[in-house]
Design a protein with these regions (language model features):
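Amphipathic alpha-helical repeat scaffolds
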Residues: 3, 82-89, 196-202
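Short beta->alpha connector loops at strand-helix junctions that form conserved
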Residues: 38-40, 79, 105-106, 128, ...
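RNA substrate-binding interface of SAM-dependent RNA methyltransferases
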Residues: 60-64, 68-152
Length: 218
């Protein structure tokens, strides 16, 4: 993990930081494991970003177990989402809208991917993430699975999102298949000429509609 801000957020969220590597002239992060001071130029060689941050850390993964689904009322499901930036943005939107957890089906990009972590702006540490879980398991928890589509289903604003729901969003290129294991279909009506919204944009719209309905009671 790269960057003092993200490392600090991981510490604040209770994640276990094993050790940190600090560039010359930079201050280590308090509580972020053993400190390794690097010689000049080393950070440029080990960092993954073009403009390296002065602090890099090794962090133990701390994702949630499937049991969280038993009590969750608002779930976001990323089904085969491949782009790290999209998943990071989805995590950020889900956390901001108050989702109880984000479920990643098999084949979805790794949430510990550095690009996911950066795009999430730290949300990956704050919203529970359940990995390698399929839609059957979500349904068995008694959650209504709402498949998203560009061409079928009720409008998201006409759908009762106050229930225990899982908003299911598919792969960027293919979306959800017509025979996806969902209970209902919803769509985002829009006036533009494009066929559909980007998956991360759609996630944001839907998450905040869930939040709006739950605040207003309708």
């Amino acid at each position: 993990m790269e960057g003092a801000v993200l490392v600090s957020e991981a510490v604040d969220a209770g994640w276990h930081v094993i050790e940190q590597f600090v560039a010359p002239g930079a201050d280590p992060i308090s509580g972020a494991g053993a400190v390794r001071h690097l010689a000049p130029g080393v950070m440029d060689k080990i960092a993954t970003t073009e403009t390296p941050q002065p602090v890099l850390a090794v962090v133990e993964r701390a994702f949630a177990g499937r049991e969280i689904l038993d009590t969750a009322g608002f779930v976001v499901v990323a089904d085969g989402v491949a782009d790290p930036g999209n998943l990071g943005t989805m995590l950020r939107s889900a956390e901001a809208a108050g989702a109880d957890c984000v479920v990643l089906t098999p084949g979805t990009v790794d949430p510990s991917n550095p690009k996911v972590v950066r795009a999430s702006a730290g949300a990956v540490f704050r919203v529970p993430v359940v990995e390698d879980t399929n839609l059957d398991e979500v349904g068995l928890a008694g959650i209504v699975r709402l498949g998203t589509s560009s061409h079928r289903g009720a409008s998201h604003t006409d759908t009762d999102l106050r229930r225990r729901v899982a908003v299911v969003l598919g792969n960027e290129a293919h979306g959800l298949s017509d025979d996806a294991n969902v209970d209902e279909w919803i769509t985002i009506a829009h006036a533009g000429r494009s066929e559909s919204l980007n998956v991360a944009m759609a996630c944001t719209v839907l998450c905040f509609e869930v939040a709006r309905q739950r605040r207003s009671g309708s």
